[in-house]
């Protein structure tokens, strides 16, 4: 009845952000929400707040910028822009080329829409070498820029291979890797199920409820693709399964590792010489003043070195260094 409490569990989708670059602008989408832009080229950019992108959809599951043609693409978005009640989990909308604000298809622009047919919702999408990979909960599609009059082509290339969580995928040197609800897959121009001797260990011990917390990270120093996930009984990431694609090629057999390395976010070595990652711990409180934050902290690591990027002098901060971790096996 109204006004009475309920003891039933409620599962909410996490408030994940999607970030991408559009020239000097950062575009940022809150999961199932609106999209913002922040311009780094203006005077005093760090003193300027991000603003909503005018004319853009106001409720979307995912977004990215196409790699060569500069269209802003929204996935699982509104069929009528500005009306959140029209959000369709299988609907795709893309802007006019070189525009963040024009989404109305006309005979003189390249804006457009597409609805995918296989699956019940789009889970995630990533840029590849020459394509965009799109996963639903049951299939994979390839999206390619083809120019006028269609702008993009959409090809259904796999079934019964959906993505388990929106960040559980990546591409390495033209090969897409991802974790599904029923195993691991790769796409190299054709779909392949990946033989995995530790598959039972992973999926029998997986908490699939917080599936959007699963994240995939590349460690190119060792030729490893890592999936960080929540084990049974845990609501935070506390396990990892790793596929070593370099050793698998050299030894001509699939090489997998498992472990308890917990990373809630991951960035491979590029700007920095080593990979960087974060993990969440409930055993500590934040050392900075955040009202109401008594449930734990997120700790930031530079893998392999133990360097505190905030204060190399060693003053205690909310960002803690790690010990030398060695190989990720």
Outline where the language-model segments fall.
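Beta-propeller and closely related beta-pinwheel folds
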Residues: 2-13, 43-215, 249-258
């Amino acid at each position: 009845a109204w006004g009475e409490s309920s003891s039933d569990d409620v599962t909410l989708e996490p408030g994940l952000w999607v970030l991408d670059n559009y020239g000097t602008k950062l575009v940022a989408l809150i999961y199932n929400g609106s999209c913002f832009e922040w311009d780094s080229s203006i005077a005093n950019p760090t003193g300027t707040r991000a603003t909503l992108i005018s004319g853009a959809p106001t409720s979307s599951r995912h977004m990215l910028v196409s790699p060569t043609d500069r269209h802003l693409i929204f996935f699982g978005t509104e069929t009528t822009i500005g009306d959140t009640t029209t959000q369709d989990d299988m609907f795709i909308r893309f802007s006019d080329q070189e525009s963040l604000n024009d989404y109305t298809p006309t005979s003189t622009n390249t804006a457009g829409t597409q609805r995918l047919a296989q699956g019940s919702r789009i889970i995630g999408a990533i840029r590849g070498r020459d394509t965009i990979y799109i996963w639903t909960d049951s299939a994979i599609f390839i999206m390619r820029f083809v120019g006028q009059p269609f702008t993009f082509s959409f090809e259904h290339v796999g079934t019964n291979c959906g993505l388990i969580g929106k960040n559980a995928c990546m591409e390495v040197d033209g090969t897409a890797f991802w974790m599904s609800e029923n195993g691991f897959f790769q796409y190299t121009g054709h779909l392949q199920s990946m033989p995995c001797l530790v598959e039972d260990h992973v999926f029998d011990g997986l908490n699939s409820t917080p599936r959007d917390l699963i994240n995939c990270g590349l460690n190119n120093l060792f030729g490893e693709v890592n999936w960080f996930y929540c084990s049974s009984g845990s609501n935070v990431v506390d396990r990892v399964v790793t596929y070593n694609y370099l050793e698998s090629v050299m030894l001509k057999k699939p090489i997998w590792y498992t472990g308890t390395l917990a990373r809630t976010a991951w960035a491979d070595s590029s700007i920095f010489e080593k990979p960087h990652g974060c993990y969440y711990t409930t055993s500590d409180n934040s050392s900075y003043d955040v009202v109401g934050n008594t449930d734990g902290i997120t700790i930031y690591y530079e893998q392999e070195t133990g360097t505190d990027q905030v204060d190399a002098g060693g003053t205690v901060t909310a960002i803690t260094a790690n010990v030398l971790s060695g190989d990720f096996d």
